[in-house]
């Protein structure tokens, strides 16, 4: 299958975007401005930068997914690697947190009680909202050791049905599913998985 990153010119449903691009399967991507639909994380499509990571998203944007010659890769991504990776790959989308890299669970920021400050992990800011790491609906993409792509959505916010997962639980799930690399995508109400 051909694997690609696509961006709608305006806010649209994952299913509509998938159908427009004749996709067999699709998952929502990274974070965006809910008023304008503009991306709030780095995205480069067909060699053109379409968005940069905003300061508000930097705390959780420590990974990226690229497509090149129908291959997908998941990378560690920060302000230093963004320029290098952004030039190397014509199609790349930043997101996060990074859940797995080479089979190793990545450490999410932790919060000592009553401090409200992140002290460990991949935090880029001490202003990480604690709520981000609570259980929520989640979406993530991963690659197995034999280069199979897995797209996963975890439902949430329904007490009797599903409460969602924390970032730590999500990285554990990615490991249990046999992924080598995995990247969290925009979750919450954006969590969408579609197949034809």
Regions from the language model: what does each represent?
Residues 103-105, 110-111, 116-176:
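Domain-core and long-helix interface of multi-subunit machines
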Residues 171-196:
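Charged catalytic cores and adjacent phosphate/nucleic-acid-binding surfaces used
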Residues 34-39, 75-76, 83-85, 108-109, ...:
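Extracytoplasmic/secreted cell-surface and envelope-processing proteins
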Residues 60, 69, 91-94, 99, ...:
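Short gly/pro-enriched beta-turn/loop segments at secondary-structure junctions
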Residues 24-28, 63-66, 73-74, 140-142, ...:
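Structural recognition of the beta-strand scaffold that forms the well-ordered cores
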Residues 30-35, 81, 147, 156-159, ...:
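Solvent-exposed loop/turn segments at secondary-structure junctions
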Residues 1-76:
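Zymogen propeptides
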Residues 35, 66-73, 77, 101-103, ...:
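Short acidic-glycine loop/turn motifs at beta-strand connectors
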